[in-house]
Amino acid sequence: MNAVAQEFVDQDPDPRETREWVESIEAVISAEGTERAHQILEKLVDETRRAGGHLPFSTTTEYVNTIPPQLEAKSPGDAAMEWRIRCLIRWNAMAMVVRANRKPGSLGGHIASFASSATLYDVGFNHFWRAPSEDHPGDLICYQGHASPGIYARSFLEGRLSTDDLDHLRIETQPGVKGLPSYPHPWLMPDYWQVPTVSMGLGPIQAIYQAQFMKYLEARGLVPKSDRKVWCFLGDGECDEPESLGAISVAGREHLDNLVFVINCNLQRLDGPVRGNGKIIQELEGVFRGAGWNVIKLIWGSYWDPLLARDTKGVLRKLMMETVDGEYQACKAFGGAYTREHFFGKYPETAAMVANLSDEDIWRLNRGGHDPHKVYAAYHAAVHTEGMPTVILAKTVKGYGMGAAGESLNIAHQAKKMHQDAVKIFRDRFQIPIPDKQIEGEDLESVPYYHPGKDSPEVQYMQERRKELGGSLPWRRQKSSKTLPVPGIRKFEQITKGTGDREISTTMAMVRGMNLLLRDKEIAPHVVPIVVDEARTFGMEGMFRQIGIYAPGGQKYRPQDADQLLYYREAEDGQVLQEGISEAGGVSAWIAAGTSYSVSDQPMLPFFIFYSCFGFRRIGDLIWAAGDQRVRGFLLGATAGRSFAGEGLQHADGDSMLVAGVVPNCKAYDPTFSYETAVILQDGIRRML
């Protein structure tokens, strides 16, 4: 929209006529509902465009909550009890990091991330996240890596971890010591963590393909249909990682309504603001809405509701839209008096709104991500959304509760130490019953853990909530209850007997091995061929017709080669995962299939085949994450070595074997003869199934 057109919109030439239109829409909403109003508005927009009007499309909405107060689902929980539990978890999460950094060596750790997201996790644990049980397959939660201390603190109150365990945060090399890793690592805690989410960006892309694979298993009849969800927690700064947003169109295109992203928008990353000169929530709303996601903005807490209700002229909403994130951060860092002057003071109307509020009242105007009632309403809406994935953009304060030690400060992410005065302020703010004499000093024991006792109302409430939801989380299944038969070496006789005078590549030999497995009635349903738009290069096009390409909505067109034997066949129950030109997508699908034995109690046998030069070199971090979570499957680096010399320097692959060798639980082979590929296949299946 050009400046002249924008000015025309902003300066209404006929407010009375505009009011009549607004009243008409209000009448439609009252009589026939919002869907009918939306239909009428879309028709009006279409007519205007057909008449030549230029109406730019906007994927963003006002800087207010998506769910109005009157439509919020009400939480069934005991709000006072849940606040008390949340305070205890906050204290112990802080204590374990501060204690770790009062030891020699300053072990590191993070306080501020969980401090900002405690309510987001608490509501999920208390009301939404189901553990695997006889009645339900369980939800999959991808926890934000830097929030791990808060997850450990909850497990401590539940009795799953001891004070000794907490005191060994980041201490994992001492003999006989359990130790707690700094981030979610299934390799280090195989019965606890499920998905490694650090390095940043790994959680979101894995969550998308885990959700896709759950739908895949259901479509192929391998598991019963259910309402299980994949929840992924990530930070707003983390969204700059290509893996964070690079696959969100997959989720929108495949209508993955079993997927929920919760983005903790505390407006800060490691060094400073995420978008100090802009608005990260608006930016992310546009990106996700454009990719076909249901976007729920959770910006303001309940204390803002009366002010917004009085904003009949829209001046407060206008101010909210104008204010950039750097200013919002300053408001929380400098307090109520600063906010009165520099935020509300920009317009006479907004200044008048808070004239009767004290500076303390203004400081207490809360953000949506810290309001359990608003969080519950957002989660409730997310789990009841059909036909599309949901992202919740929750605005929070980084370092919430840390005060001068880090609350809304640029140094919050690096804050690992809190001195005596800051610890006392934290204790008082969250009403922890620890006397002054126990927190005087700067030694280790001056920041004690607090547990109210296993029979306390708080612990009993926590355990009752988790019992109703199937059990404690995090929890990881280490071994599937199902077993698959392992074929003998004779199954691969067509490969082991050789090809006579005719030479074939080892890539072709491997593909033949896959085809032999697809003819085995017991193993075939569990084989998952995964390609990234190179099936024809590797001689796999025969699988298109034989087992079909997975397409959630089926094939809605007649393929160009439909009259040929090996035509391009897509089907709702197709077996091949065709991930397009995306090695990161292909390996994430492979990870989902290779962890199915643990996540879904359904062992599978995935084969991800790719140009060797674009494997470990390009997606090494995801492959390392695969090793971390004990993926079972085959990675096939095809057309390797000198095969690509003619393609240019970037394609020359002489290092993949070297890189593969540094992943400890990746058994790397470079076969020369066909019979070697048969042995590798048979022995690999024996090892993994």
Mark where each language-model region is.
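Long, well-ordered, tryptophan-enriched scaffold segments
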Residues: C265-K497
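Cofactor-binding active-site loop characterized by glycine-rich and histidine/acidic residues
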Residues: L71-E72, G77-I89, A93-K103, H110-E254, ...
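N-terminal amphipathic, basic-rich helices that act as targeting or association modules
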Residues: N2-E158, S162, F426, E503-D520, ...
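A glycine-rich helix N-cap at a beta->alpha junction
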Residues: R160-E172, G252-N264, G286-W293, W624-G641
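Non-catalytic terminal/interface segments that mediate subunit docking, oligomerization
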Residues: E72-A93, F114, W129-P132, D139-L140, ...
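Acidic, glycine-rich active-site loops and adjacent beta-strand->loop/helix elements
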Residues: G145-P149, W231-E241, N264-R269, G301-W304, ...
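Short acidic, glycine/serine/threonine-rich loops at helix termini
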Residues: Y152-F156, P181, E218, L222, ...
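Active-site phosphate/pyrophosphate-binding segments
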Residues: G488, D628-L689
